[in-house]
Amino acid sequence: MKKYLPLTRWTSLACWFLLTFHVSQVFAQMPNDAIYMSKKTACLAVTYSHSSWDKYWENSLRRENLNIGTHTTQSVMPMLAVGITKNLNVIAAVPYIWTQTSAGNLMWQKGFQDASGWLKYRFLNVSGFSLHAIAGGSIPVTNYIPDFLPMSIGLQCKTATARLLINYRHKSGVYMTAHGSYIFRSNIKIDRDTYQADEKLYDSDQVRVPNAYDAAARLGYLKKAIQAEAYAEYGACAGGDFIRRNDMPFPTNNMKSTTVGVYAKYQPKNIGVNARAAHVVNGANVGQSTAFSAGILYQFRYARADKKL
């Protein structure tokens, strides 16, 4: 006989990492790749993402929850990448997210989540080998509820991220990329005067959300109008507690996940399309989600090129 359990959820440490885009010629890019827009060129992308799970890890115990059935998170995200120089790019994005379940009576949540901005700088580029320093931050743009999990669309914390990225690209188009990041996260305020975390009872509406870190490796091919890659990612919190037995999750939980995925893009000219699929293969305090995304990209010049004398 199957046991009915309280709800749980999985929220990605960086929701919009699932939504990515590239453009050929001067390829559009993300904060986790070595691709840059050229000076005075930009790329606007709009991506739809669908992520769902019906099993999750309560700490390290993999289980299901018949009270919510299948949990689904969907999002639409516009993103703009702008080339300031050939070695410096600015990226900005804000996703609109909605959550729902196939069972139970929990009210689904929807709204704009967090506005994110990134600076990406290439400080070394020699014989196909390059090093990149990347800094980013995010801030909530709406007053969504952070502790109504698994239905919350985010954690309501401000973040600051530092990342180092290494890339090697062969003249054949084959490339390898690896990066590591550390994510600082602010405290949040919840609409209650007391809560339980770390096996303690806190008489406060201020919650300390643990910092996080991530790492990834990618192997792909990029040449002319075609890009394809396979990747593996790992993300975790730097501390935090666990989902208590038969209890709801909370923003203080130490969420960990190992994800594998594939990505493909086709862009013969300035308009292109891309698609991505990813699956969480292992984790703790997260859902075993499968995610798909598809996007359309438009590359344009936002200023006239300098005239040659």
Report residues per predicted region.
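Outer-membrane beta-barrel biogenesis signature
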Residues: 26-61, 68, 302-309
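Residues that define the transmembrane beta-barrel architecture of outer-membrane proteins
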Residues: 40, 72-76, 109-115, 129, ...
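Membrane-embedded beta-strand positions of outer-membrane beta-barrel proteins
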Residues: 44-46, 80, 92, 119, ...
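Transmembrane beta-strands of outer-membrane beta-barrel pores
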Residues: 48-54, 94-100, 123, 137-143, ...
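Repeated loop/turn-to-beta-strand initiation elements of outer-membrane beta-barrel proteins
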Residues: 54, 87-92, 126-131, 173-176, ...
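Outer membrane beta-barrel transmembrane domains
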Residues: 57-59, 64-66, 201-309
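Outer-membrane pore/translocation modules
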Residues: 105-207, 252, 267
